[in-house]
Amino acid sequence: MKGLKPLSLSAVLGSALLLNAVFSFSAVAGLLEKGRSQGLTAGIANEQPYAYVGTDGKIVGANVEILRAILEPLGINKVELPITEFGSLVPGLAAGRFDLIGAGLFINPARCKVIGYSNPVTRSGGAFLVKAGNPLKLHSLKDVAANGKARLATQPGSNQVQEAKDSGISNGNVVLFDKDTEALAALQADRVDVVYFPDAEIIGLLKKAEGTPVERALPFEQIPDADGKPTWNYHAYGLPKNDPAFIQAFNEQLAKLRASGDLLKILQKYGYTENELPPADVTAEQRCNR
């Protein structure tokens, strides 16, 4: 899943009409009942590290493992994972083409008008990739600006370019690459000092850079919002809006999975860190009403 892909308001509102007009079996009988008797379908978008086709042809990913760990204690042992385009996930759930969204999806107030959400599973922000040992001690955009000579790599047209500018990094110290792998190569060749991308991309780059002297800069200070608090996006599962019993049961199992430590263990298998866990008291309702 690429959570930052926008879904147009017209598409969202159009889906809302579908939601009101189309009621699948799952919406009538409830997903708990349907899941236990028939199994469920969870739409995915074939994107790493969330839910994707592995080298053996099986669908794997952090979201797939977490989903099964939530559903199995509820007596739901069969889950089919149809692949669709990312932009078709919300309309597909609204139209009843599948029972829930198994790919991680940013909680977005516009989408909240159309679908329900689980409570957040992970959070996403920016991240730095640096040379091993982080020789320049770069843990924030402010650190790069204060250094004055550190060269930061990112992609043209991305939010990261504006964030670098807003943080006081001079244009001459921002080096743009069309592909994240090109930015990684520049870091490895000492042509830049730090690579700045959303954390999911940094996690992917780390896997590609395995065996080379680069690392993720931790801790990392996120850019502040208007209230001076760190800016985060929150991933969750998309659930049917008109099935509160299922949403409650899903969230209860998610909370148990987190409290046991098993949620973090699954995430760590895919390159996540504890930094990607949202605060336990952040809820979908809060994010929908912000």
Where are these regions (language model features)?
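Extracytoplasmic small-molecule ligand-binding "clamshell" domains
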Residues: 30-104, 113
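Alpha-to-beta junction loops
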Residues: 41, 76-78, 95-103, 148-151, ...
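Bilobed "Venus flytrap"/periplasmic-binding protein-like clamshell domains
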Residues: 41, 46-49, 59-72, 127-179, ...
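Periplasmic-binding protein-like
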Residues: 45, 123-127, 210-251, 274-290
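Extended ligand-binding regions for polar small-molecule ligands
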Residues: 61-74, 134-135, 150-151, 158, ...
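Acidic, polar ligand-binding/catalytic clefts
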Residues: 68, 79-144, 220-226
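Ligand-binding clefts/hinges and TM-proximal coupling segments of bilobed small-molecule sensing domains
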Residues: 80, 159-174, 248-290
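A ligand-binding cleft/hinge motif common to bilobed small-molecule-binding domains
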Residues: 88, 104-113, 163-166, 193-231
